[in-house]
């Protein structure tokens, strides 16, 4: 533990002045340094310059990629002439456009930033950054403003048309001085957006008229014609847009605009995009989303095996890229959505074990408060939902009960989701005959219901009191009790639920309770309770069909199963349930007929799954083999499909942390190997002169002992030299539990990629490294990660996983 004397404001000012004077001296002695990085130098000399870790070029550059781009294999060979002064800048522009076509916006922006680093005056590079931020208008505005500024020199007329068209599309910032505009005029905003979109379409047509050989303009116009519906500009003819795309494919049959044709026909006529579905992935095999998109078409056409192949290909390409570039999974566009849809398709085709494995894998991925928690549409939420779905729809009650004590379906702070899980746990306990434990779980749900009902009564009393007070004169001053009541909301971390919210919660819980009571009635053969509770439980139709058959309502169950087969054709589960119920009813000929269909549908299914294993007598009766599945006949419309293992690994794996060595305040070398064999948190901070960094240390230091109790070491590495580190410690006024180390030459920052390659400056970083030296969690940003409690909880979760 380090204890130091108080750090006075005067000392802080002197340190800041010393640093500024040192910088001025360095710049005076080395004019070339100033010339090489004018924005950086100007910002550092300006007292109003950016905080440590922030971009020298403005706030728009803070978010997004900060590490250098490389030329990636598997990008479509785009031709897009620009004013680039170097071949490298031109290559990165063309790579960026290929990535735009694949909606790979993070990497597209990285490519365009690399082009700008190669050629700082290249206006079209900032146009590309704008295009890569189509869904982030504040950042897009900053980039297009820069492009407009640079377009005045060394820019061709064609490039200028691209830039000016996009400038008119991106909304200008509103005037904050208008105090009278209390509420935005939504209708006026919609109309303005529509007009800007119509003007952009007109501008792109003008560009095409002047440069008719510009294939990329055709592709981007086709995309915008499809996107324009979101801005109120309707597509009057999809076939006209399709014809425009046809001109692109005439010039380049493997153009990545196959992606746009899939979007064009996805919801309208998916069969019109089968050819593009076959060519989309091979047109840009290094972009995961290009493998994902054909899955839309195949899913709509109920070709679930083909869709699952596409989604697995997408996942593998993403996994390979993440491991190669050290990104965390949910930083990747569309990653979680692709994988959760893959689980749904695996359920459809009966690949139950793969569905379970992938769901658990999604849950196991690193959580982050910005993009992967229960409240975000990330891997954790999707994984939990799909794991429960797979277990319940395939009636894997024993496995579901095992999860109650496992690492994947742990208790959650979200009441409604915890109740959903407890409800299914009670169902599983009843279905497996553990009536005692099931009743205990049911009572816990009933207690929750009583608490909610009491809350409703309290809120109704509160509303009545408020209504009564409104009728009274307000001449009487508020008493102390009323003042205390008014202060209560400030003491709460989140607002109390409203009466309507609590009532909706009760409705959801009542549905869960009805589901549990229905399961209890099935096992007790209590038909009266079953008939009363079943409609309230809103069960999945196939679960309901099986429960009805078990309680004796076989005919009703068969009707539900027949409807499910009709509504969900080409899916394994409806057919399996129908065959089972028909066989139990004695309708063996009908069962055999549907079984013959199931043999083809279940060509990739897990036959050891209980739902399918119970059909062995039917298979024997029709003379089928033990493995009664029939192979899927080869299709001629799938295009060239590479072996899946060539695209990447099936699962994301954490990467190996770099080796490192830093100096302690006494100048001794501390090697990273000293932490081998035990988990550790490494914090990269930007010195005592960085106020945000000190705030981070403030957050983590009080929890140092809690981390140690969890078996996790914590160490912080600074950009300061040993001398600067000691001076900071001397002037700092509080105890610091966390060992602080010096990395004055910043090579460790670069090794861990806590470095802005574009502006040559360090970034904030926080890492969890396990006992094997694998990086299990990370945050690299222009701001430090300050939620020490979240990371402690998440570290415990991740380290407990197998």
Q: Residue spans of the language-model regions?
A:
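N-terminal alpha-helical interaction modules that lie
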Residues: 37-261, 270, 282-284, 301-313, ...
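N-proximal helix/coil linker or "cap" segments that precede and/or mark the start of modular domains
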Residues: 604-659, 673-676
């Amino acid at each position: 533990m380090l204890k130091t004397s108080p750090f006075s404001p005067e000392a802080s000012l002197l340190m800041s002045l010393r640093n500024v004077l040192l910088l001025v001296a360095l710049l005076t002695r080395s004019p070339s340094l100033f010339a090489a990085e004018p924005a950086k130098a100007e910002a550092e000399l300006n007292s109003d310059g950016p905080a440590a870790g922030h971009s020298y070029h403005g706030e728009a550059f803070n978010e997004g990629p900060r590490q250098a781009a490389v030329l990636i294999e598997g990008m479509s060979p785009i031709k897009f002439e620009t004013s680039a002064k170097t071949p490298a800048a031109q290559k990165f522009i063309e790579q960026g456009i290929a990535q735009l076509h694949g909606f790979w916006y993070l990497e597209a922006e990285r490519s365009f930033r690399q082009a700008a680093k190669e050629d700082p005056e290249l206006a079209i590079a900032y146009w590309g950054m704008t295009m890569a931020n189509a869904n982030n208008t504040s950042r897009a505005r900053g980039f297009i403003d820069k492009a407009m500024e640079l377009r005045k020199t060394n820019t061709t007329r064609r490039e200028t048309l691209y830039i000016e068209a996009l400038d008119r599309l991106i909304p200008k910032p509103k005037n904050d001085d208008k105090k009278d505009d209390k509420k935005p005029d939504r209708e006026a905003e919609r109309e303005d957006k529509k007009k800007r979109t119509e003007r952009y379409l007109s501008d792109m047509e003008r560009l095409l008229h002047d440069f008719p050989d510009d294939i990329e303009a055709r592709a981007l116009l086709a995309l915008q014609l499809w996107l324009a519906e979101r801005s109120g500009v309707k597509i009057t003819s999809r076939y006209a847009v399709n014809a425009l795309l046809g001109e692109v494919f005439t010039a380049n049959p493997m153009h990545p605009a196959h992606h746009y044709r899939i979007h064009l026909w996805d919801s309208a006529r998916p069969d019109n995009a089968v050819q593009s579905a076959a060519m989309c992935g091979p047109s840009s095999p290094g972009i995961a989303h290009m493998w994902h998109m054909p899955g839309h078409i195949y899913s709509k056409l109920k070709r679930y095996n083909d869709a699952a192949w596409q989604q697995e290909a997408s996942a593998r390409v993403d996994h390979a890229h993440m491991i190669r570039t050290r990104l965390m999974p949910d930083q990747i566009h569309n990653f979680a959505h692709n994988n959760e849809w893959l689980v749904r398709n695996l359920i459809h085709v009966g690949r139950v074990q793969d569905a379970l494995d992938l769901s658990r894998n999604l849950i196991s991925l690193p959580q982050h408060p910005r993009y992967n928690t229960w409240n975000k549409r990330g891997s954790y939420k999707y994984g939990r939902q799909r794991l429960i779905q797979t277990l319940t729809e395939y009636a894997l009650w024993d496995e579901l009960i095992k999860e109650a004590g496992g690492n994947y379906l742990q208790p959650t702070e979200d009441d409604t989701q915890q109740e959903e899980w407890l409800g299914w746990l009670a169902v599983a306990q009843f279905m497996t005959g553990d009536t005692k434990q099931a009743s205990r779980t049911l009572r816990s749900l009933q207690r929750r219901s009583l608490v909610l009902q009491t809350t409703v009564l309290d809120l109704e009393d509160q509303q009545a009191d408020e209504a009564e007070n409104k009728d009274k004169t307000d001449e009487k001053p508020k008493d102390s009790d009323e003042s205390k009541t008014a202060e209560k909301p400030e003491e709460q971390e989140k607002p109390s639920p409203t009466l309507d919210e609590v009532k909706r919660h009760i409705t959801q819980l009542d549905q869960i309770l009805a589901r549990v009571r229905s399961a209890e009635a099935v096992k007790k053969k209590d038909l009266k309770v079953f008939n009363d509770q079943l409609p309230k439980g809103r069960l999945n139709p196939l679960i309901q069909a099986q429960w009805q058959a078990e309680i004796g309502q076989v005919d009703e169950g068969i009707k539900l199963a027949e409807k499910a087969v009709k509504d969900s054709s080409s899916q394994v589960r409806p057919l399996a349930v129908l065959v089972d119920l028909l066989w139990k009813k004695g309708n063996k000929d009908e069962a055999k007929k549907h079984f013959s269909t199931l043999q083809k549908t279940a060509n990739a299914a897990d036959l050891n799954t209980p739902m399918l294993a119970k059909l062995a007598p039917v298979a024997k009766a029709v003379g089928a083999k033990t493995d009664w599945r029939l192979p899927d006949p080869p299709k001629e419309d799938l295009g060239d499909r590479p072996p899946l293992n060539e695209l990447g690994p099936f699962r994301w794996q954490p990467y190996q942390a770099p080796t490192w060595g830093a100096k302690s305040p006494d100048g001794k070398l501390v090697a990273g190997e000293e932490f081998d064999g035990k988990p550790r948190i490494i914090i990269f901070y930007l010195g005592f002169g960085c106020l945000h960094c000190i705030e981070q240390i403030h957050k983590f230091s009080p929890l140092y002992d809690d981390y140690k109790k969890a078996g996790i070491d914590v160490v912080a590495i600074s950009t300061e030299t040993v001398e600067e580190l000691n001076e900071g410690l001397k002037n700092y006024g509080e105890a610091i539990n966390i060992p602080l180390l010096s990395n004055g030459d910043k090579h460790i920052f670069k090794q861990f990629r806590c470095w802005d390659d574009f502006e040559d400056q360090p970034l904030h970083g926080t890492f969890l490294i396990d006992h094997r030296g694998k990086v299990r969690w990370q945050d690299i940003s222009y701001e430090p990660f300050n939620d020490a409690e979240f990371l402690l909880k998440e570290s415990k979760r991740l380290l407990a996983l197998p």
